[in-house]
Amino acid sequence: YFISRRLYQFFVYPEIDAITEEKIIEPMATKFRDSNFDLIETLKLLLKSEHFFDSSNFNSMIKSPLEYVYGALKFFNLHQEDFYMNLLNYKDGNSYELPEKFTNPLSREFYFYQKFIWDLEQQGCNFGDPPSVSGWPPYYQAPVYDLFWINSKTLSSRAGFANNFQWDLFIYNDWENDSDVKYRVNYAKIIEGFDNPSDIYSVVNQFVNNLLTVELGQEQLNDLTEIILGSIDPTYYTELYNRYTENPTFENKNELNERFRNFTTHLLTLSENHVF
C-alpha cells in the first residue's frame, strides 16, 4: 500500500481520500503483489485508468523545478548549432570559434546541462543531492506537499530562468577570452513545424497549447499576441514569415526570432505555466 500511495501521489495528486484509497490504491496494491512486485504493471493500471484522465485532476499540482525547466527545454528542442560566443566588452561583427569543450560531443553535454542543473538548484531542487533519504518535501510532506516548490526565492529564480529566453540562455563563462557562451533559441525552426505558421494567431495558440495545460482566455491570448506584434499589423508578421521561408538568410531568421524573445519570457512566467 505504501508504494501504491507514493506512485499515486507522484503521478496524480498528493492527497488521498477514503474513496481513492478504496477504488484506486487497493487495486494498485493488489496488482503490485500479484504481479510479483512489478512496478511497470502497477503503473499501467494507474495510468490507463479513467481516474487518471479525470479532468478534475488536471492542473492540480505545481510543477517541480525539473518539470518547469526541462519541460521548456524539451519543447524548444535545443540544437548545438545555436551555441555562439558572445564577447563581453565589444562586438566587431566577426564570428568566433567555440571552445573545443563545446564541440566535443561528450564535454558539450556536460557543460550544457551543468547550467540547467544550477537552475534547478536555485529553484529548490538540487538534482542528485536531495535534502534527506526521503527526498524532497513536496513529494511527501503533508499538508503542504507541492506548495513547497513556491516561495519568494524560488519564484524569483523561475522568473530568472524565463528571462534567459529574452536575452539568450547563458551557458558558460570563458574568463580567459573575456567572453561567454550562450544559446540562442531558433524560433524560426520551431514555427516551421507548426500548422499554418504564417498566421500569428495560430502560432500563439500553438505555443500556448504546447507549453500550458490551462486554457487561456481571449484577453490573455490578445496580450501575448500584442507582445509579438508590438505596433505592427498582423499582416506584417505574415510577410515577415514568408520572407524568411523564401530567403532564409541570417538577417531574415534573426528578424523573425526577435519577435518571439519577450513573448517566450512572458509565456513562461504566467501563473498557468507553473501547474500541470
Which residues does each PLM region occupy?
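Helix N-cap / loop-to-helix initiation motif
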Residues: 38-39
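Flexible, low-complexity segments enriched for small/polar residues
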Residues: 1-35, 44-276
